[in-house]
Structure formats: C-alpha cells, structure tokens
Amino acid sequence: MFKIKKVDAHCDIPCAVYDPAVAQFAALSVVRFLDLIGEMDDSLSSKEDIAHLSRIMEQKESHAKEVKDAVATIWGDYFKEPHMEKFPEIHSLTHSIMMTASKCKQSLDRENGLKLVELVNRFAEIFWTTKEVQVESKKSLNPPNL
C-alpha cells in the first residue's frame, strides 16, 4: 500500500523527551577522537594506519554532527518564549555550538573540541535550569577526563 523507504526524525509529537546528555557525550567524544588522532604517528606508514585514521576521522565528524542534531532538536522543539526571555543567550549559544561543531569537523585543533564541550555544557545547564533541576559540573571518568 505505502512505499515508504526510510524516515528519520525526532518524533515531533512532541514527546517531551529531551536530554542534552546526547550532545554532551558526543562533544566529549569529539575531543577524545582529536586526542587519538594527535597520538598517531605523522608518517602513516602502513595501510593499516591510514585505515585507522580514516575510521577515527569519520567518527569525529559523525559525533560533531550528532552534537549539532541534538542541540538543534532541543533548541527548536523544547525551548519556548518563556525560556528565551529568561535565557536570551540561548540563540547565540546555539549558533556558537553549530559553528564550533563545524570547526571540529573541519580541523584537528583540540581547542575547538574543548570549546565545543564548554558550549554544550552551558547549553545543558540552561536546559536543566528551565526544568528547575539543580546542576553541578563533574569531570568525566572517561578519557579525555573533562
């Protein structure tokens, strides 16, 4: 009857199931991938090394995109006018996250990854504050231990 091949989307019901932890994990992963790339020998002397670098690069870019997707969904679907009045920075913060995630895809500069984690953590802080949840910063037990 229907010939639907593939559908990808956040539910848009709206389901009210939002959590910036996805973006936080992905941003932390971007830094980890940048670190793994930095630990590699510059010579890339074997096909195995080239394949390994290619896999890490693909994951770095995929996780940077995941940050963008998760943040865009929360920003676009969750944040409403009262939130924006209380946190007018949310628009510029979201834009900065998008731009910084793109920089992470385009370069190997670890500072971009660190900035992405910082921005996403601020986004998460605002999100949870709108839900009246007390927020505290913790270091990840996983590398890169940020």
Regions found by a protein language model. Give the residues of each.
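Short, solvent-exposed, charged loop/turn and helix-capping segments
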Residues: 70-87
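N-terminal intrinsically disordered, cationic/polar leader segments
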Residues: 1-54, 83, 88-122, 126-146
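Alpha-helical segments in soluble extracytoplasmic regions
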Residues: 46, 53-71
